Swiss-Prot record:
Gene encoding the protein: dtl-a
Metabolic or biological pathway, per its Swiss-Prot or TrEMBL entry: Protein modification; protein ubiquitination
Main location per the UniProt record: nucleus
Molecular-function GO terms, alphabetical: protein-macromolecule adaptor activity
Protein name: Denticleless protein homolog A
Length: 710
């Protein structure tokens, strides 16, 4: 009976029918803590604290509790996490490199490890003896990642800032005392240039062991093995995760290497960002890629789809030093963060709030989950410490002594609905708070330098100062009829050109008293039966935009008849026009300086002699008035008004002037001709005379406007 009862009793962790019973392990995540004995300071060569960059638990069965830590000065230390004696806690310490060690990897099943350093080399070490086995040379920049295959102990891969991925085999003989790469992928994460595609040309044979190119802008940040013949890599700027087949030769042709599969950047950022860490779950199916856009993407490494299966949010990733790790059973994901904490997500529920390991005072960079013990986690931080987190053994509440010894604790992060929505959409503009009476000036960003120099200090400005003063605003117009409604604006199609010129911002469209305009208004003049107002464009006149402001030189020129004529706005040397006021002055020899077009219709045909004050204008218009009767002048004015001038108009004018009988009868034609030649531009071409267009075929300018309705 006793034997049967023992056999029928369910085993620990199994149900009644022998099926494994799954415990809710996520409830245990909040029980992680770190005490002072598990906090280790990373010291440099001179005894000063330096930040640790990499940590990894051993893969040897009898040494799975040994933690290897590499720091910024190239020192590697081995800690026994099971030992409670502080004197025996540090197992081994040696100077691996003279530069920073960025990554570290254990040889599967052996007491050896490989370090990747900023001195452009990777070294193989015997950790028990502390001796150097071999040195790998071939990279031309810092090495950022090193990884071993689970199926091969002698083969490992490295990735560097030179953009190259190199394969190493420690079974090969050393040349010159160093290991050389057996295979390499040059420019693994170079940006694709669509305008200048690479040409298919054979590579020239190069010296074995030297990388053919250096491109620090296309750095390879992480390389891991998927299986014996496949590696996965990620870069710093291209935002693509690539899978490579090592059985293919990528250096035979001068072209960018093509991976067998790639995962494009799945985020919403306009600029493709890079990845700082890649990690596979124990089955090798799920690939976790930690991106610098504060997301961890989970891809199906064995499937055909390239879209992420899940996205883990909540942490911050602002550097390429932040790494990730997976629990031994593959149920949880661990990652460092820039907000001084480590995060743990449940893989099966990515939308659930993560558990944070708090206590560090700087960025948490490298993390490691012990593959032989679920209850043990290691974290490295920029606060120059390495911490080992363990599950609390007791189920009772912590005593006062335990709280004093605790330097790290775990808690569940609370997600706010606004923060979750902000991760899924583009942030909008902040709304203005109506309750606040002050508007603060912008504060410096968190990444701004401390030495601000002469920059102004943040201040608060009353909102009332930003509001417009009602005294400075235009008051509402009140109708004369007594109604408090402003008159209806006239449509632009029914308004004449006079309304556009004389209206001011404070005047209405129609009023009983005309509001004087600050600009000179156009005065209506009598028009010819078939000719509108005309203007002659002189030979040396330059085309420019019409301005209604008065120039400083002609500010004193006032028309005696108050005709409101439009005067010249620029000096005569720049813009000389046919000013009717100057012509009228020479005709009457009086103070009346205004000439209206109605006088021209009466047959005004006299020759004007220029006065000293108007010599500049009269020299330009003298030859034009000598053309003959008024009908010829009308024809010229009409052509200049209603048609654009031809390129040979200057030569045609001179030819017509020479052939005029009145000009032949004049006493001194040579002086006038010389004056005209001085006014002509040098580059005027000589071409035949153009025939003017008959005025009958032209449309009157007055037909383009509507009469103002009264």
């Amino acid at each position: 009976m006793l034997f049967r009862s023992v056999m029928n009793k369910p085993r620990l962790g199994y149900g009644q029918k022998g099926a494994p019973f799954t415990y809710p392990l996520q409830s245990l995540l909040q029980c992680y803590q770190c005490v002072k004995q598990d906090e280790h300071i990373s010291y440099g060569e001179l005894g000063m604290p330096v930040p640790p960059f990499g940590c990894a638990f051993s893969t040897v069965p009898d040494m799975s509790h040994v933690l290897a830590v590499a720091n910024e000065e190239g020192i590697v230390r081995l800690y026994d996490t099971e030992c409670r004696d502080m004197q025996r806690l540090l197992m081994k310490e040696f100077m691996a490199h003279t530069n920073a060690v960025f990554d570290i990897a254990w040889v599967p099943g052996e007491h050896k490890l490989v370090t990747a350093s900023g001195d452009q080399t990777a070294k193989l070490w015997d950790v028990m003896a502390g001796e150097l086995i071999g040195e790998c040379r071939g990279h031309q920049c810092s090495l950022k990642s090193v990884s071993f295959s689970k199926f091969e102990r002698a083969v490992f891969s490295t990735g560097g800032r030179d953009g190259n991925i190199m394969m190493w085999d420690t079974r090969c003989s050393k040349k010159d005392g160093f290991y050389r790469q057996v295979n390499q992928i040059t420019g693994a994460h170079n940006a694709i240039d669509k305008q200048t595609p690479s040409k298919m040309k054979k590579r020239k044979p190069s010296i074995r062991g030297l990388a053919p190119s250096v491109d620090s802008q296309q750095s390879v940040t992480v390389v891991i093995f998927q299986d014996e013949y496949t590696i996965i890599s990620a870069g710093a700027v291209d935002g693509v995760v690539k899978i490579w087949d090592l059985r293919k030769n990528y250096s035979a042709y001068r072209q960018d290497p093509v991976p067998v599969k790639h995962f494009p950047y799945p985020g919403n950022s306009t600029r493709k960002l890079g990845y700082s860490s890649l990690v596979l779950d124990p089955t090798g199916t799920n690939l976790f890629a930690s991106c610098t856009d504060d997301n961890v993407y989970m891809f199906n490494a064995t499937g055909l789809k390239t879209d992420p299966v899940s996205i883990f949010r909540g942490h911050q990733n602002s550097t390429f030093y932040i790494k990730a790790s997976v629990s031994p059973d593959g149920q949880f994901l661990l990652s460092g963060s820039s907000d001084h904490s480590a995060y743990i997500w449940q893989v099966s529920d990515p939308m659930a709030a993560p558990v944070t390991l708090m206590g560090h005072c700087q960025e948490v960079t490298s993390v490691a989950w012990c593959q032989s013990d679920f209850t043990k986690i290691a974290t490295c931080s920029d606060d120059n410490t390495v911490r080992v987190w363990r599950l609390k053994r007791s189920c009772e509440d912590s005593s006062e002594s335990d709280k004093r010894d605790s330097v790290g604790w775990a808690c569940k992060k609370k997600f706010e609905p606004s923060s979750m929505a902000a991760n899924l959409c583009t942030p909008g503009k902040p709304s203005v708070m109506s309750s606040s009476s002050l508007t603060s000036s912008p504060t410096p960003a968190s990444c701004a330098p401390s030495n601000t120099g002469d920059l102004p200090m943040p201040s608060s400005t009353p909102i009332s100062a930003l509001l417009p003063d009602p005294k400075l605003q235009t008051p509402k117009r009140i109708n004369n009829g007594g109604l408090g409604v402003s008159p209806k604006q006239m449509s632009s199609s029914k308004m004449s050109i006079k309304d556009w010129v004389t209206r001011t911002p404070k005047s209405s469209t129609r009023t009983d008293t005309k509001t004087p305009s600050p600009r000179k208004a156009f005065t209506p003049v009598e028009q010819y039966p078939s000719v509108s107002s005309a203007r002659v464009q002189l030979p040396y006149e330059k085309r420019a935009k019409r301005r209604l402001e008065t120039s400083s030189e002609y500010a004193e020129h006032v028309c005696p008849d108050n005709c409101n004529c439009v005067r010249e706005l620029e000096p005569g040397l720049k813009k000389a026009k046919l000013d009717v006021c100057f012509i009228d002055k020479e005709r009457d020899s009086s103070d009346d300086k205004c000439l209206r077009l109605s006088d021209l219709s009466k047959g005004f045909d006299q020759e004007l002699s220029p006065s000293p004050s108007t010599s500049l204008h009269m020299n330009a218009t003298e030859n034009l008035l000598q053309l003959g009767p008024l009908s010829e002048l009308k024809s010229v004015l009409l052509d200049k008004e209603n048609s654009s001038p031809e390129k040979n108009w200057l030569s045609a004018l001179g030819h017509k002037f020479k052939s005029s009988p009145q000009n032949k009868a004049s006493g001194s034609p040579s002086s006038r001709t010389s004056t005209t030649k001085k006014q002509q531009p040098r580059n005027a071409p000589n071409s035949p005379v153009s025939v003017p267009t008959p005025p009958g075929s032209m449309r009157k300018i007055c037909t383009y406007f509507f009469k103002k309705s009264e």
